[in-house]
């Protein structure tokens, strides 16, 4: 059918991925100004924490939030044209994206309504994350194929661990951790979305390699049937993220909000689960891990000694307090994120 219509190229994953990426990017450029204007008219402005860097209270006041809406709109419209909508992995990732985005949307809305940075009750927020991660990981466990409960370790050719049904709580931990660490990192113009572009780009490569029997056999990594549609999904996410960065780069015209940050983190975590890259993901998302550890260390040490290890947490604020400009922090963190990604990808061959 495709051949008769002269659409043979639609059989190729690389072609569909390329155009899903370009399409999502162009949609973001076209609809970005309209969405920013609409959010401003609705007075959906970013609510800033009073305990953050003082200059943020003046520089970032009045910037519209909930920018995740722009990303997901562009991604979903693009995917409608380029992806197999009934692929099981796509449906699971789609559920994760929508459910965590709704949770983040509620959080953003409450912050704006109450005019403070508290948002959802922390207990309700974590319960929501537990519920959505439990549903999605359980779906993955039962519909994800024979390899799904096996964990593969970087650097080791034959070292693997089959968790069985315990993979469900393990996967939930990955999902919730990824979601919250991304949320913590979203504190400077372009920081979180730039780092997510690096992680997403690396996952595109991994997804493509695992979808091909020849590459998977050569690299001694699992061949995951159906993961080729994840290449297209990640491509669209990459394009939407680049489009969002166009408006989120310093000085930002729009902020991602929890609508975007909670969801993108969870989506990347779920993608890592599907691609059997759970341990590799910890290396790939190294900057996000460091940001989260800085908060955990800061809180734990302060509770015990009443002293601070960092001038301010998360880690990006520590460097701001040391005198780095916002753009210096962002670009240097991007560079570090890229190094982590290169290390992670290199482990595919070092086995």
From Swiss-Prot:
PANTHER family: PHOSPHO-N-ACETYLMURAMOYL-PENTAPEPTIDE-TRANSFERASE, PHOSPHO-N-ACETYLMURAMOYL-PENTAPEPTIDE-TRANSFERASE HOMOLOG. It is found in: Cell inner membrane. It comes from Borrelia hermsii (strain HS1 / DAH). Its cofactor is Mg(2+). GO terms for cellular component: plasma membrane. The keyword Magnesium applies. Keywords: Cell cycle, Cell division, Cell inner membrane, Cell membrane, Cell shape, Cell wall biogenesis/degradation, Magnesium, Membrane, Metal-binding, Peptidoglycan synthesis, Transferase, Transmembrane, Transmembrane helix. It is an enzyme of class 2 (transferase). Catalyzes the initial step of the lipid cycle reactions in the biosynthesis of the cell wall peptidoglycan: transfers peptidoglycan precursor phospho-MurNAc-pentapeptide from UDP-MurNAc-pentapeptide onto the lipid carrier undecaprenyl phosphate, yielding undecaprenyl-pyrophosphoryl-MurNAc-pentapeptide, known as lipid I. Belongs to the glycosyltransferase 4 family. MraY subfamily. Pathway: Cell wall biogenesis; peptidoglycan biosynthesis. GO terms for biological process: cell division; cell wall organization; peptidoglycan biosynthetic process; regulation of cell shape. It comes from the Bacteria. This is Phospho-N-acetylmuramoyl-pentapeptide-transferase. CDD domains: GT_MraY.
């Amino acid at each position: 059918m495709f051949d008769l219509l002269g659409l043979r190229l639609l059989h190729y994953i690389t072609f569909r991925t390329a155009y899903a990426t370009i399409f999502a990017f162009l949609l973001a450029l076209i609809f970005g100004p309209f969405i920013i204007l609409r959010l401003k008219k609705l007075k959906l402005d970013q609510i800033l924490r009073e305990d953050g860097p003082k200059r943020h209270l003046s520089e970032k006041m009045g910037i519209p939030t909930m920018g995740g809406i722009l990303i997901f709109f562009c991604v979903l419209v693009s995917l409608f044209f380029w992806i197999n909508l009934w692929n099981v992995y796509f449906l699971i990732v789609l559920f994760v994206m929508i459910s965590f985005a709704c949770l983040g949307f509620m959080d953003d809305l409450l912050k704006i309504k109450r005019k403070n940075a508290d948002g959802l009750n922390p207990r309700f927020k974590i319960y929501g994350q537990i519920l959505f991660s439990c549903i999605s990981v359980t779906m993955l466990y039962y519909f994800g194929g024979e390899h799904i409960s096996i964990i593969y370790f970087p650097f080791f050719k034959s070292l693997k661990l089959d968790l069985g049904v315990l993979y469900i709580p393990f996967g939930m931990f990955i999902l919730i951790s990824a979601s919250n660490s991304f949320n913590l990192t979203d504190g400077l113009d372009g920081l979180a979305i730039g780092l997510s572009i690096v992680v997403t780009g690396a996952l595109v490569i991994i997804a493509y390699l695992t979808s091909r029997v020849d590459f998977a056999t050569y690299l001694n990594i699992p061949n995951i049937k159906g993961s080729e549609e994840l290449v297209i999904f990640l491509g669209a996410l990459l394009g939407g993220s680049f489009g969002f960065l166009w408006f989120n780069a310093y000085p930002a015209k729009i902020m991602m909000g929890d609508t975007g940050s909670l969801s993108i983190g969870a989506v990347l975590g779920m993608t890592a689960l599907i691609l059997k890259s759970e341990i590799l993901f910890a290396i790939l998302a190294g900057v996000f891990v460091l940001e989260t550890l800085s908060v955990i260390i800061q809180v734990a040490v302060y509770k015990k000694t009443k002293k601070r290890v960092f001038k301010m947490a998360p880690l990006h604020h520590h460097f701001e307090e040391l005198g780095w400009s916002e753009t210096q922090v962002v670009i240097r963190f991007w560079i570090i994120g890229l190094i982590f990604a290169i290390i992670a990808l290199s482990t595919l061959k070092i086995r």
